[in-house]
Amino acid sequence: MKFYSVKMRASLNDRHVSGGERITTEESIQKVVSELLTRPKEFDFVNIKIEKINNIKFIEKSLDIKTINVKNHKEGNEIALKLLEEVGIDREIAKAYIDLLHTGANPDRENMRGAMIITRSGKRVEKDRYRGVRTTNVDFLHREEVKKILLEKKYTERTLDALALSTKNLNHLDIIAEYCISDQPDYTTGYVAVNNTYYRINPLKEYSNPKGGRIYFVKDDTDIEELYKYLQEESFLIKEVGSLE
């Protein structure tokens, strides 16, 4: 079976406003393109890129999902720090970079386009502090079935996409954990991915805060060139969804 990567990027007044990507079969390309084009509410430029995938790899099962509801974002981040501490991430190191993410992680104190990469010892090692690194080329093999399962459990398509990304991330042996908050001011749910589990924490950031992004915590001896290649170039389909709580 042939698989294709379909990527959409939309902008308004030269500012990125929406994006999405899927891996699909040749027969479903037109349907997927139509679905992606419904994502941006307003735009003056949209780019669709369709590319054949020559080497597709498979992950048997996604991370499990656990939802944690808390009173406020401070309590949510306390839980996040404890989860990170459990896998050997120093609390003060984690807190410093999480605080930075909540206030703007690029040199201009705005949002980065991709993720920060932080080693266990606290070094910040992504190649570009404006661009960061983006995880791409991952989807569910039976996306519509998994989407239906998640929606029945009151999750969203946003969760579906984030679960796919975090599953690919933690599939890499050098990625210890991931921390993520949205850059949308009215979306306060975030997650920590660690120990084969996607901990969905609500809320993880303060309402009306426009800052957001991702942090990938990695081992000290991580080969950064290889990691970039894995995250940005290697293509994966996830066969099944993990357990849901």
Curated annotation (Swiss-Prot):
InterPro entries: BioW. Disulfide bonds: none annotated. Pathway: Metabolic intermediate metabolism; pimeloyl-CoA biosynthesis; pimeloyl-CoA from pimelate: step 1/1. It catalyses: heptanedioate + ATP + CoA = 6-carboxyhexanoyl-CoA + AMP + diphosphate. Keywords: ATP-binding, Biotin biosynthesis, Ligase, Magnesium, Nucleotide-binding. It holds the Pfam family BioW. GO terms for molecular function: 6-carboxyhexanoate-CoA ligase activity; ATP binding; magnesium ion binding. Catalyzes the transformation of pimelate into pimeloyl-CoA with concomitant hydrolysis of ATP to AMP. HAMAP family: BioW. This is 6-carboxyhexanoate--CoA ligase. It comes from Sulfurihydrogenibium sp. (strain YO3AOP1).
